[in-house]
């Protein structure tokens, strides 16, 4: 190209035609019959200037219900949290601005160190020994955990609580179908996994049991009781967890979890329709050589200086091919970096305070709903989400709330017929007392 930023100039076209030995564009396409060639002009709008284009796109974007102008009480896996300003600044640096894993670690020390710090912080939050460099999202991390369990135990049955995120369960079903595994759902009772049903289903054919903590309804599962049931038959205990909640809750590792997975979206990753997110995957040392995805390790170079490498690669698909522990050969490097920067900026006390505010504000919202005459469906402890009985279709309620610049909660009837007309309300640290009061009052007026 003669001009780096002006591709396909007349000079470029002439040079390319000469190189391939033809004189004109028509000669280049001479093999295409004249009868089927397009003639005339394409029916597209005239080109716009940069300022005109920005104005038009801004007008289109303004039609969306964005979280700068709307108070959001919608969670169900994607949450409106505070992201420190420094996050965007750091991840926009050219050295970091890639979603991919470095293949030349010796010249990517900064990137590898950032991933190493992500792994370290995930281990500290979950109480586990080792974490990978991240997964695509929480759903794929959950499915990969089940595949690891099935491969390790050589058993074909997977038990998953119905209180696990419905979309994560759908991803699990997709993975399991290809591996000819049986997925059995354990019903929930009073908002948490039914332990009696779980006890009756766990036998020596079960590879693993998967629960969520806090679960999809916001309730805190009794991990200590579940762990005893699971390990009686030497099945693996897998816990999907909101990492922010672990700033306040006892980490799953303390309850004997074998694998802890989840989505790091609460840390520095904005809400968005469809992703990308950042799954995390942490486990005990026993499964270190079976963990999926990239692992960054710390070492020293020939001069004795600290360095970072992609380690234990012999288990990965690009080396072991069909015998690899997983098909994933990548990670979410940029979003993992965002999560690392957010956690670092907040610090340990900041993460704890952020989690505490989620709990206190959600508790305040629950009390306000009850004072207004609403029924909060489940009575157990919860983190930042709870279920409200709307007594009418949730869609009607949300449509009315949207007119008041409020994004209402998740319609549980979409996934659970028994919870029709029930709304899953999420309250994060960003919601103010005024916003919570307005939500409750507006829903009370609709009731």
From Swiss-Prot:
Its EC number is 1.4.4.2. SUPFAM superfamilies: PLP-dependent transferases. CDD domains: GDC-P. Keywords: Oxidoreductase. GO terms for biological process: glycine decarboxylation via glycine cleavage system; nucleoside metabolic process. Signal peptide: none annotated. GO terms for molecular function: glycine dehydrogenase (decarboxylating) activity. It comes from the Bacteria. It catalyses: N(6)-[(R)-lipoyl]-L-lysyl-[glycine-cleavage complex H protein] + glycine + H(+) = N(6)-[(R)-S(8)-aminomethyldihydrolipoyl]-L-lysyl-[glycine-cleavage complex H protein] + CO2. The glycine cleavage system is composed of four proteins: P, T, L and H. In this organism, the P 'protein' is a heterodimer of two subunits. PANTHER family: GLYCINE CLEAVAGE SYSTEM P-PROTEIN (PTHR42806), GLYCINE DEHYDROGENASE (DECARBOXYLATING) (PTHR42806:SF1). The glycine cleavage system catalyzes the degradation of glycine. The P protein binds the alpha-amino group of glycine through its pyridoxal phosphate cofactor; CO(2) is released and the remaining methylamine moiety is then transferred to the lipoamide cofactor of the H protein. Belongs to the GcvP family. N-terminal subunit subfamily. This is Probable glycine dehydrogenase (decarboxylating) subunit 1. It comes from Bacillus cereus (strain ATCC 10987 / NRS 248).
């Amino acid at each position: 190209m003669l001009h780096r930023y002006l591709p396909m100039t007349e000079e470029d076209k002439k040079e390319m035609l000469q190189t391939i030995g033809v004189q004109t564009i028509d000669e280049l396409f001479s093999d295409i019959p004249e009868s089927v060639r397009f003639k005339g002009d394409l029916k597209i709008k005239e080109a716009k200037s940069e300022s005109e284009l920005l104005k038009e796109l801004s007008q289109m974007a303004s039609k969306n219900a964005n979280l700068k102008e709307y108070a959001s009480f919608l969670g169900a896996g994607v949450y409106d949290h505070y992201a420190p300003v420094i996050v965007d600044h750091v991840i926009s640096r050219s050295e970091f601005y890639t979603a991919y894993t470095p293949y030349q670690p010796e010249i990517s020390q900064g990137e590898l160190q950032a991933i190493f710090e992500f792994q370290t912080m995930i281990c500290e939050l979950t109480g586990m020994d080792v974490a990978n460099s991240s997964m695509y999202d929480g759903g794929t991390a959950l499915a990969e955990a089940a595949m690891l369990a099935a491969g390790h135990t050589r058993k074909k049955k997977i038990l998953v609580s119905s209180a696990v995120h419905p979309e994560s369960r759908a991803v699990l079903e997709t993975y399991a179908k290809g591996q000819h595994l049986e997925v059995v759902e354990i019903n929930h009772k009073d908002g948490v996994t039914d332990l009696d049903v779980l006890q009756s289903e766990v036998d020596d054919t079960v590879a693993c049991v998967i629960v969520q903590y806090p679960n999809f309804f916001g309730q805190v599962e009794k991990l200590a009781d579940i762990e005893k049931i699971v390990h009686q038959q030497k099945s693996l205990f897998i816990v999907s967890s909101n990492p922010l909640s672990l700033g306040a809750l006892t980490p799953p590792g303390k309850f004997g979890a074998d694998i802890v997975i989840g989505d790091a979206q609460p840390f520095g990753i904005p809400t968005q329709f469809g992703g990308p997110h950042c799954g995390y995957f942490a486990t005990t040392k026993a499964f270190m050589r079976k963990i999926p995805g990239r692992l960054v390790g710390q070492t020293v170079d020939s001069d004795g200086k600290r360095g970072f490498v992609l380690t234990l690669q012999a288990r990965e698909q690009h080396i072991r091919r069909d015998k690899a522990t997983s098909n994933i050969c990548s990670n979410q490097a940029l979003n993992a970096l965002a999560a690392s920067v957010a956690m670092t900026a907040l610090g340990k006390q900041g993460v704890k305070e952020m989690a505490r505010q989620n709990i206190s504000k959600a508790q305040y919202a629950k009390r306000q709903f009850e004072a207004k005459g609403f029924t909060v469906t489940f009575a157990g402890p919860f983190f930042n989400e709870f279920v409200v009985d709307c007594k009418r279709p949730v869609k009607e309620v949300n449509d009315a709330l949207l007119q008041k610049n409020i994004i209402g909660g998740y319609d549980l009837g979409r996934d659970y017929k028994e919870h029709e007309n029930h709304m899953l309300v999420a309250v994060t640290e960003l919601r103010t007392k005024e916003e919570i009061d307005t939500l409750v009052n507006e829903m009370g007026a609709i009731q």
